């Protein structure tokens, strides 16, 4: 990174040159601004490797299951028992850009109609999110399907804007084909950077609903709040895609968000053709909305009473 100097909207002149000139293309800007993959907090063992591991340790391993197994590290902060962990299904899919995609299906609401296709934030992976998915799904009566972006967790490749879109396409297809979940029973849920692939997919496919948690208008508008239009070198132009989303959209944003200003959520809400009553969480920042009681209350109201449940 360049040395520090005079700053503009949180960026020094040197940082701006580094950001936009090395090289000047949206995908590189996107990677520098948005992607912070953590050290993986989990591993996934295919069936054949489970057999090998069991033989090496002398432990018995189940035969004939043909399923991958999930192994969490201490940094995953697992909050449940082995029983819940055993109910979490993990597997690999493949994207159109030929990256291996780590996928997770959390069956926490067997009687629920809807499944969330959850696109997480930029500094976590499936291992860190697993406990949250179980808690969220069981409280709002939804199963949860999620995936790690290219370059995150066990997913191969490098994080990029193009890979984001290919990743969620592969996740969408896996949820539909592997689990037989139809579009009218899928709720697309995006959080922070996860709203980018969510909006892109929702602008191309109709689904039961869309939830945008701390969304951004575009990458350039995050770095430069006074930006009023989308330039050719901008990244993540969700603000230009949201008008094409025909499904009901719930926007959630904290009024004191220090990462993606509240104005982003408001602008996205105003552009939605089928926006429902939003949730503006007074005093909440970027990473603590889930701690406020109205978060779960609004989700329950939206899913149980504002969407069809028969």
From Swiss-Prot:
Its EC number is 3.1.2.22. GO terms for molecular function: palmitoyl-(protein) hydrolase activity. One of its GO terms (cellular component) is dendritic spine. It catalyses: S-hexadecanoyl-L-cysteinyl-[protein] + H2O = L-cysteinyl-[protein] + hexadecanoate + H(+). Its main location: membrane. GO terms for biological process: regulation of postsynapse organization. The keyword Transcription does not apply. It holds the Pfam family Hydrolase_4. It is a lipid-anchor. It comes from the Eukaryota. The active site is at residues 192, 257, 286. Palmitoylated on cysteine residues located in a cysteine cluster at the N-terminus which promotes membrane localization. Belongs to the AB hydrolase superfamily. ABHD17 family. Hydrolyzes fatty acids from S-acylated cysteine residues in proteins. Has depalmitoylating activity towards NRAS. This is Alpha/beta hydrolase domain-containing protein 17C. It comes from Gallus gallus. The lineage of its organism: Eukaryota, Metazoa, Chordata, Craniata, Vertebrata. The gene is ABHD17C.
């Amino acid at each position: 990174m360049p040395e520090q100097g005079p700053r503009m909207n949180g960026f020094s002149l040197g940082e701006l040159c580094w950001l936009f000139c090395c090289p000047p293309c949206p995908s590189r800007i996107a990677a520098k601004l948005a992607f912070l993959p953590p050290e993986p907090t989990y591993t996934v063992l295919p069936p054949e490797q489970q057999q090998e591991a069991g033989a090496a340790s002398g432990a018995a391993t189940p035969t004939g299951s043909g399923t991958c197994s999930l192994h969490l590290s201490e940094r995953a902060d697992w909050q449940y028992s082995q029983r819940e962990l055993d109910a979490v299904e993990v597997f690999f899919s493949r994207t159109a850009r030929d990256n291996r995609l780590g996928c997770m299906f959390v069956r926490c609401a067997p009687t629920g109609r809807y499944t969330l296709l959850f696109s997480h934030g930029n500094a976590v992976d499936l291992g860190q999110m697993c406990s949250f998915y179980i808690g969220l799904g069981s409280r709002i009566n939804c199963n949860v399907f999620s995936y790690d972006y290219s370059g995150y967790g066990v997913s191969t490749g490098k994080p990029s804007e193009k890979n984001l879109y290919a990743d969620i396409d592969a996740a969408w297809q896996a949820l539909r084909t592997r689990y037989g979940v139809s579009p009218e029973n899928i709720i697309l849920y995006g959080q922070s950077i996860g709203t980018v692939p969510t909006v892109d997919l929702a602008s191309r496919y109709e689904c039961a609903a869309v939830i945008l948690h701390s969304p951004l208008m575009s990458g350039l508008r995050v770095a430069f709040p006074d930006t009023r239009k989308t330039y050719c070198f901008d990244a993540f132009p969700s603000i230009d895609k949201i008008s094409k989303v025909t499904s009901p959209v719930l926007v959630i944003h904290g009024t004191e968000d220090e990462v993606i200003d509240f104005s982003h959520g408001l602008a996205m809400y105003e552009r939605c053709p089928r926006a429902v009553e939003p949730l503006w969480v007074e005093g909440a920042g970027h990473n603590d909305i889930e701690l406020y009681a109205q978060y779960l209350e609004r989700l329950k109201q939206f899913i149980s009473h504002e969407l069809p449940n028969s």
